UniProtKB/Swiss-Prot annotation:
Gene3D superfamilies: 3.40.1280.10, tRNA(m1g37)methyltransferase, domain 2. NCBIfam families: PRK00026.1, trmD. The keyword Manganese does not apply. One of its GO terms (molecular function) is tRNA (guanine(37)-N1)-methyltransferase activity. One of its GO terms (biological process) is tRNA N1-guanine methylation. It comes from Staphylococcus epidermidis (strain ATCC 12228 / FDA PCI 1200). It is found in: Cytoplasm. Homodimer. The lineage of its organism: Bacteria, Bacillati, Bacillota, Bacilli, Bacillales. This is tRNA (guanine-N(1)-)-methyltransferase. One of its GO terms (cellular component) is cytosol. Belongs to the RNA methyltransferase TrmD family.
Length: 245
């Protein structure tokens, strides 16, 4: 996968891209990343990339020329996913991360200032994506977050490719509780089922815990999850237990 970042602050990406999983993915040749300072593509003698909005208003708007010129230098085609980091976009989810992990080429447009000239949005962008209902100074941090979520899903990136399959949201539920040694710590014990060696019982316990944890922390996710009759029984039993406690 090729990943290009159009940004005014390419140095922001150095720390994230040069450590941990993203560094290993580059070392393995699985991803090829490139940061492009679109200020270098300004047609203004002062390298200006923003200007006042037509019609008046607060803040500055990102000019179209630097971004269009930078995109012309990128070897992209109709299959390239050009992502605009934008609070107006669709919320980023694990499902979107999985979808984008199958792309061959992704371009992140990371803006600053009040907003983008609408012609950038209309004529260059394939996807507008938001990290949530809040506003950040620029698109760099969201682009880094998305990159981490996407790249770890590409086959060969993780040491154990199955390790992401139990992550929260991978199947629509939150992840089950995890334990490691010691078996007991400060009078807190590991659930006996995890020590039993009975994998069928362990799988059942983990599924129950995923349902319960999702009900406790993100009940909205259950509205979209295809609950079985057994799942409903588990949740009803848990709700009754809460009432009795």
């Amino acid at each position: 996968m090729k990943i290009d970042y159009l940004t005014l602050f390419p140095e922001m990406f150095e720390g994230v891209l040069n450590h941990s999983i993203l560094k290993r993915a580059q070392d393995k040749g699985i991803i090829n990343v490139n940061t492009i300072n679109f200020r270098d593509y300004s047609i203004n003698k002062h390298n200006q990339v923003d200007d006042y909005p037509f019609g008046g208003g607060q803040g500055m708007v990102l000019k179209p020329e630097p971004v269009f010129n930078a995109m012309e230098d990128i070897n992209h085609n109709e299959h390239t996913r050009v992502i605009l980091m934008c609070p107006q976009g669709r919320p980023f989810t694990q499902e979107i991360a999985q979808e984008l992990s199958e792309a061959k080429h992704i371009v992140f447009i990371c803006g600053h200032y009040e907003g983008y000239d609408e012609r950038i949005r209309k004529h260059l962008v394939t996807d507008e994506i938001s990290m949530g209902d809040y506003v950040l100074t620029g698109g760099e941090l969201p682009a880094m977050t998305m990159t981490d979520a996407i790249v770890r899903l590409i086959p060969g990136v993780l040491g154990n490719q199955a390790s992401h399959q139990d992550d929260s949201f991978s199947d629509g539920l939150l992840e089950f509780p995890q334990y490691t040694r010691p078996r007991e710590y400060k009078n807190m014990s590991v659930p006996e089922v995890l020590l039993s060696g009975n994998h069928a019982h362990i799988d059942q316990w983990r599924h129950e815990q995923k349902l319960i944890r999702t009900y406790e922390k993100r009940p909205d996710l259950l509205e979209q999850y295809p609950l079985t009759e057994k799942d409903r029984e588990i949740l009803e039993t848990y709700k009754k237990k809460l009432k009795n406690d």
